[in-house]
Amino acid sequence: MRLGEKSHLKTHGHHSEEGFSVTLADTGLDCMTGGRLRKVQKYIDGDTFLLTYGDGVSDVNIRRVLDFHKSHGKIATVTTVAPIWRFGMLEVAGEGAVTNFTEKPKGEGSISAGFFVCQREIFDYLGGDECIFEHEPLERLAKEGQLMAFRHDGFFYAMDTYREYQHLNDLWNRQAAKWKLWEDVPALPRLVSNR
């Protein structure tokens, strides 16, 4: 997709999905995550909606997250995963001897995977352009008992650095992308017109 003076939309392959609408909204360069969400409120239909930051990939079952969200009646659900350490973890004795080494272990606790299900009431928690969704709105929802966590134990990987970008592209190119849950559909033949 290219926007601007010479806008262009290209569809890759043949897809059977129906009823999808994509809206691109310019929320400004200086607007923070909560402010961006507030600015797109007018484009969101219905009482329940999904949102993600778009910088992580996962094999999370979105239907299960949505069902979990509907089961508890709270304002928001965040998908959580175990933290993954970027470096090996060492246990070191007092004199410097390494007693245990674990390469890039999964940590204890939970971190946000950045996949959310929200009710429209979420907009009551958002401020202006400076509002950071991950701070005051989510902190307030948690204090009020309106934020639930859906634990995902499958694949999750964030793409925040060039190194992560390279790793994820390598997985894709080797056809080892665990987040690719869809089947490729052969493209339909193109009809050539002389018009």
Regions found by a protein language model. Name each.
Residues 48-50, 57, 62-70, 81-85, ...:
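Catalytic-core segments of class I nucleotidyltransferases/pyrophosphorylases
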Residues 92-93:
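Extended acidic/charged loop-beta regions that coordinate divalent cations
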Residues 1-53, 64, 161, 190:
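Conserved N-terminal catalytic core of the sugar/cofactor nucleotidyltransferase
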Residues 46, 73-74:
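Short, high-confidence coil segments that cap the C-terminus of an alpha-helix
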Residues 88:
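Glycine-rich phosphate-binding loop of ATP-grasp-fold ATP-dependent ligases
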